[in-house]
């Protein structure tokens, strides 16, 4: 994993005459074989949603395109009364060049979530900080006394859930819900270098943390 992604791909090309991809006619020359794809997919991606009846707060982890891929599901879960409040976490810039928390809040307000049910975490720059800062808000404000849910992308959910589980008090039951973006799904992530980079980063972190299989 120390070798850069581009160098690794170039090295694979030199000794693999025809990369074998199980899910597609062409791997676009990226050099991942069937066994590698299946192994990495199994480690990184969940196979099913974490079923839950209700959570007092849903933490939505910010990202560049959170309003496109995450917030529609967050609002739906809120309107279905699966969650009572939305905690929007992230201080990086979103696609509209606003902080993630601000961009996500605007989406929630525009789609019928009242301001009184929106909590903001304004500073997190990575998943560790998402978990740490959001957990501090949850405990200090006492917005959840029984259960918390988190929402992020499929390739991100395993490590995010692990970090939140370790950051939250043990008395809080933790649930998770994942969404898919266009290019980093369990059925297409190996087709572009950017998606491979995201998945391989998650793969490395999951292995390093010792995250157990998704259940």
Language-model features and meaning:
Residues 6, 12-13:
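Basic polycationic patches enriched in arginine
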Residues 31-191:
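A structural signal for short, hydrophobic/glycine-enriched beta-strand patches
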Residues 183-215:
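C-terminal capping/extension of enzyme domains
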């Amino acid at each position: 994993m120390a070798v850069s992604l581009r160098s690794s791909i170039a090295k694979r090309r030199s000794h693999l005459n025809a990369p074998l991809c199980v899910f597609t006619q062409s791997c676009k020359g990226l050099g991942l074989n069937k066994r590698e794809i299946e192994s990495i997919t199994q480690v990184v991606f969940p196979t099913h949603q974490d079923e839950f009846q209700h959570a007092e707060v849903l933490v939505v982890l910010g990202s560049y395109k959170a309003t496109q891929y995450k917030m529609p599901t967050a609002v739906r879960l809120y309107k279905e009364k699966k969650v009572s409040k939305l905690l929007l976490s992230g201080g990086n810039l979103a696609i509209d060049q606003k902080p993630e928390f601000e961009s996500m809040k605007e989406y929630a307000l525009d789609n019928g979530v009242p301001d009184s049910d929106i909590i903001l975490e304004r500073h997190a720059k990575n998943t560790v900080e998402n978990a740490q800062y959001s957990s501090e808000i949850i405990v200090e404000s006492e917005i959840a006394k029984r259960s918390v849910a988190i929402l992020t992308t499929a390739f991100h959910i395993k490590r995010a859930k692990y970090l939140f589980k370790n950051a939250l008090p043990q008395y809080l039951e933790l649930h998770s819900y994942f969404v898919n973006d266009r290019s980093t799904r369990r059925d297409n992530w190996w087709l572009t270098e950017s998606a491979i980079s995201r998945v391989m980063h998650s793969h490395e972190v999951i292995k390093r943390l010792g995250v157990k299989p998704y259940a």
